[in-house]
C-alpha cells in the first residue's frame, strides 16, 4: 500500500496544481535522472509529467564528467533558466546524497520561484558536510523530502571476502517512492472528481490512438514528447 505516502502530496496540493493544469517536473543528476525517465511517457504513468533533461548531467555523453559537473556551483541556474515553469507546476528533485551543488541549488531556485518542491534523498547523508556554497542538504530546501533508505555509498550487499559493497538500491527504492507519490496524487484527484490523464500501453487495442491524443494536447508544454 502507498498509504504512508499520502501526506507527501496532500489534497490541497493536488487540487491546486494538478487540477489547475500544472505539470509535475522531475529532475536529477547522474543515475538520479533515471527517475525522470521512469515516470515519463509510459503505460500507467501520468500524462502531465515533464522531465528536466540536461545531457551533460546525464551519463551517455561522459559519465565521469557528469559527476564533476554535478558539483559545479552555478550550473543549476543555467539548467533552471532553460526551463519554462508554470505557477501550478510541482518539482520533484532527486539526489541520493543530497549534498552536491546542482540538485541543491536547483531545488532552492525552484522554491524561491514559488514552486512546491518534493525531494527524494537518503537520510544517511545528513551527517555528511554539504558540498555546495549554500551549506545545505537537499532536505533543507524542499517542502518535504522522502528518505529513499539508501545506505551511505548506495550499495547494500557485502558478500564475504569482497572488499567493496555491491548492489546499489537508490534507483529501486526511488522508483517505488516516486510512483507511490504519483499514485496518491491520482487517487486524491479522483476522489475529488478530477481525472488525471494517464497513458495506456500502445500494445493494447486503441492504446496508441489514445496516447496520440494525449501527446497532441501536451506537446507544446512538454517539448520532449
Where are the language model's segments positioned?
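Structural signal for hydrophobic packing residues in well-ordered secondary-structure cores
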Residues: 3, 18, 43-47, 142, ...
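Short glycine-rich phosphate-binding loop at a beta-alpha junction
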Residues: 22-28
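A short, well-structured juxtamembrane/interface segment
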Residues: 2-20
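Internal, active-site/partner-interface "lid" segment
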Residues: 154-158, 176, 188-211
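Acidic, Ser/Thr-rich low-complexity intrinsically disordered segments
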Residues: 205-225
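Glycine-rich phosphate-binding loops that contact phosphosugars or nucleotide phosphates
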Residues: 29-182
Amino acid at each position: 500500500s502507498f498509504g504512508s505516502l499520502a501526506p507527501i502530496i496532500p489534497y490541497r496540493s493536488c487540487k491546486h496544481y494538478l487540477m489547475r493544469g500544472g505539470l509535475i517536473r522531475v529532475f536529477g543528476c547522474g543515475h538520479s535522472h533515471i527517475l525522470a525517465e521512469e515516470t515519463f511517457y509510459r503505460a500507467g504513468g501520468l500524462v502531465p509529467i515533464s522531465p528536466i533533461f540536461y545531457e551533460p548531467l546525464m551519463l551517455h555523453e561522459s559519465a565521469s564528467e557528469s559527476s564533476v559537473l554535478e558539483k559545479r556551483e552555478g550550473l543549476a541556474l543555467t539548467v533552471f533558466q532553460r526551463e519554462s515553469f508554470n505557477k501550478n507546476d510541482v518539482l520533484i528533485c532527486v539526489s541520493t546524497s543530497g549534498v552536491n551543488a546542482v540538485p541543491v541549488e536547483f531545488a532552492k531556485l525552484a522554491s524561491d520561484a514559488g514552486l512546491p518542491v518534493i525531494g527524494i534523498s537518503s537520510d544517511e547523508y545528513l551527517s555528511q558536510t554539504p558540498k555546495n556554497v549554500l551549506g545545505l542538504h537537499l532536505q533543507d530546501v524542499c517542502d518535504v523530502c522522502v528518505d529513499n533508505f539508501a545506505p551511505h555509498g548506495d550499495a547494500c550487499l557485502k558478500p564475504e571476502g569482497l572488499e567493496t559493497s555491491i548492489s546499489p538500491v537508490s534507483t529501486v527504492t526511488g522508483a517505488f517512492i516516486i510512483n507511490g507519490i504519483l499514485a496518491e496524487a491520482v487517487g486524491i484527484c479522483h476522489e475529488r472528481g478530477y481525472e488525471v490523464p494517464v497513458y495506456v500501453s500502445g500494445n493494447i487495442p486503441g492504446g496508441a490512438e489514445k496516447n496520440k491524443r494525449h501527446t497532441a494536447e501536451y506537446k507544446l508544454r512538454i517539448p520532449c514528447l
